[in-house]
Amino acid sequence: MKHNRMRRLLAGVTAAALLAAPALAAEDTAPAPQMPDAWAVGELADSYAMGLVDDNYTTYIQSTITSEQLSAMTGIVADKLALLELPQRAADTEGLVVDTTRGGVMNALYQEAAAYDIDGVEEGAAAFLTGLGVVRGDQAGGLNEDRPCTYQEAMVMAERLILALYDANDAGSRGLLWKAVNGDNTLYLLGTIHMDRSNVYPLHKSVRDALDASQVVSFELDLNDQEGMALLAQLQAYSDGTTLADHISPELYARVQAAAVSLGMEPNGFDAYKPWALASTFGVLSLQDDTTGANAMAIDVYINAYAVNAGKTIDSVETYAFQGGIFDGLSAEYQEAYLDASLAGYEGMLNGEAADEAAQALAQAQQEQIAAMFDAWKDRDPDALAEVY
């Protein structure tokens, strides 16, 4: 898991491929990918951001959900609902059958909501969930509660339940969102932080509504630009026959090797990469913590997946060649110092109290700053953000 996350960060495309496009099988004998139905595509970005699906969802999304998967899913729902800090109630869920049928999944999700004093929760699973729009039934209005439930169906129910209750309580991360209107033209400007932490998902309904209302969504970089990402990958790696060890001190190289091992890689796993590429990646890793989602979906990556799955036109204000060229043009001395500082932050985060005092102090300062930044971002408080950034 850590190794995969590191590779995605180096590629600059963490979860950017969470789009409803056909996957290519590695071999002709590999099972055909399980793609989401059209009606569920719009639910993918939020489901992934909240950990309801992972990178391998095309191997199971159309299969009947297992008991283990359902348990993990309801655990995520429970954690998200707990963050709302709603008044609790003595839930009467005795006799509810929890299994892998649609009705059983509905009961499992209902149990998590029934622990709180929510309007309509006393009406029972079916009435409560249909009232919220979590379960919508087939064209004839049937809920098909006895039918086996696919993972896709359970995922959508769980995602809709979380969003419905967050929206009902005016909750969710508001982000730094501005709106400008000129005649018939409306422009939304959303400032993002290129990370996932502080339980940032789900985003507030106002942010999702702004996305829904937009025709064009423009980013710093186009996360769907495969040629640009390939160019960035070339800039990040040595092509002259040298390796990282030839460009940094032996002491720093030994620390990079230790970091590679901590991420489940071979000691020489980073040999191909330039110091600036590793520095930016360790910088992101050092700021993640136990509030980072399982998929570590950066906010801009979520916005991209949401927009692409909704059929929005995607644009960008910079190119990979421009941005990568800036980093690649840094002096060798600056790159080494940049890597040293970023790696120190990662080591402090990784080693905790076992790190030396300087590393602990650096890690703590970084964590406090990024936590304050996310708090300000979630509260839509630009003044608070300016104080800590």
Q: In which residue ranges do the predicted regions lie?
A:
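Gram-positive cell-envelope targeting signals
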Residues: 1-27
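Extracytoplasmic Gram-positive cell-surface binding/anchoring modules and repeats
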Residues: 26-78, 88-123, 134-161
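Hydrophobic, helix-prone linear segments
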Residues: 28-57, 64-94, 305, 309-315, ...
